[in-house]
Amino acid sequence: MAKDIKFSADARSAMVRGVDILADTVKVTLGPKGRNVVLEKAFGSPLITNDGVTIAKEIELEDHFENMGAKLVSEVASKTNDIAGDGTTTATVLTQAIVREGLKNVTAGANPIGIRRGIETAVSAAVEELKEIAQPVSGKEAIAQVAAVSSRSEKVGEYISEAMGRVGNDGVITIEESRGMETELEVVEGMQFDRGYLSQYMVTDNEKMVSELENPYILITDKKISNIQEILPLLEEVLKTNRPLLIIADDVDGEALPTLVLNKIRGTFNVVAVKAPGFGDRRKAMLEDIAILTGGTVVTEDLGLDLKDATMQVLGQSAKVTVDKDSTVIVEGAGDSSAIANRVAIIKSQMEATTSDFDREKLQERLAKLAGGVAVIKVGAATETELKEMKLRIEDALNATRAAVEEGIVSGGGTALVNVIEKVAALKLNGDEETGRNIVLRALEEPVRQIAYNAGYEGSVIIERLKQSEIGTGFNAANGEWVDMVTTGIIDPVKVTRSALQNAASVASLILTTEAVVANKPEPEAPTAPAMDPSMMGGF
């Protein structure tokens, strides 16, 4: 395929046009008075949203050079969303500001590499100062406040705060569509996995069709149990304790299953068998998780263990197990807390190392099950369009809240970025590096400027007053008042603000140091065959 190539100023200018088109579309959503953007969908009704990354992903420009610029900014939004879960619009606004100011200086003859070094130094100083002025987030009210700011709904803030309180900060909180119009919270405490009983005759409550085991022993194995003789010595030992047994195995079939069912029906022995969750290597990892949670050992050839030789020492224990036809929930496992903490640390390190979104999601689920539960926020709305928009807002709020708990909070509404200007301005740099620092100083003002503009105020006036104010005091664009931002609940997670600035500076620097852009030339359309003269067509 033939290529189209542009150099120097032509290359940068074409990319910057794309940056501006995307940023101008996204930045109208910033702040409490931000507007919505309507996105046409190939099927169904249009999507109305104010979520920066969702809008950025939809933008595709006809001009290849402009499209490359737009895609780079879209990448900033996506990366910020992946790291912090929010702050995508702020990242887009910062990128545009750094690119715009940087391009002026490069065009005037400044060295792009020197500018880049200055930008990197200034951003590092800004990030350090953000961490210095951060306040830790703890307590239900503070968590609810962060979530309410991000979702623009106090009710959603309460749901997320309650969910995190119930399942822990590392717990899985999923967002699903409700069948009704009301949004509600449902929490499953304990470790849950999607495997139900192998026989309905194992239920203890015929009305609810569930089996509830109080203070059970738990046998965990990756083997298939077909012969009852394999586990008979172990069953006899458990029978002496007069406690129920949960069997988690690759499968239970052959003569083993009917024998267990028969003993259950006769009242000899209260036992429930379920298949092991997951597949392949993930199954082994999940069985190990269950073993650590319950204080048991996985009976597997990998450890040189055989079912025939298994003793009571390999069995796990828990306060309660509930099994229905589709799922199993283990509550209050008897595992050692330090062993569980070590397992959680291993899973967290695997999450950081993986590059696969799917693997990260599965690791997050395992982490949550070890940490103590799963919460489901069921979103209700009057129309499908409203439902989609609400789900996006709640996802943003959930990510922002987790980020706040992790690294703390700073004043919201772009105030924190203006608060760090003094520290960045104090940097002693020379030449083009000083120019790079000055570009960052100007860019740090841009989110406040845009929030003020969207709310109908003059940004320059707001910024000048903000620079004279104490740290923590800021402009509430929702009502035009000057307030203590944290006390009023206008806050941003440090992780969100930091990620937005770092990602914006990274991509903007790449654009400024670009000297050539290579794009595919559009292929000429194939000529269409001329229509045949009807008089030349044969008849029957």
Curated annotation (Swiss-Prot):
What processes in GO biological process is this protein linked to? protein refolding
Q: Does the keyword DNA-binding apply?
A: no
Q: Where in the cell is it found?
A: Cytoplasm
Query: What's a single GO MF annotation on this record?
Result: unfolded protein binding
Q: Which Gene3D superfamilies match?
A: GroEL, GroEL-like equatorial domain, TCP-1-like chaperonin intermediate domain
Give the reactions, separated by semicolons, that this protein catalyses.
Answer: ATP + H2O + a folded polypeptide = ADP + phosphate + an unfolded polypeptide
Kind of enzyme, top EC level?
isomerase
Q: Which UniProt keywords apply?
A: ATP-binding, Chaperone, Cytoplasm, Isomerase, Nucleotide-binding
Q: What is its EC number?
A: 5.6.1.7
Binding, ATP: 29-32, 86-90, 413, 476-478, 492
Q: CDD domains this protein is in?
A: GroEL
Q: Which superkingdom does the taxonomy of this entry point to?
A: Bacteria
GO CC entries: cytoplasm
**What's this protein's family per the entry?**
Belongs to the chaperonin (HSP60) family.
Its biological purpose:
Together with its co-chaperonin GroES, plays an essential role in assisting protein folding. The GroEL-GroES system forms a nano-cage that allows encapsulation of the non-native substrate proteins and provides a physical environment optimized to promote and accelerate protein folding.
Subunit description:
Forms a cylinder of 14 subunits composed of two heptameric rings stacked back-to-back. Interacts with the co-chaperonin GroES.
Q: What is this protein called?
A: Chaperonin GroEL
What gene name does this entry carry? groEL
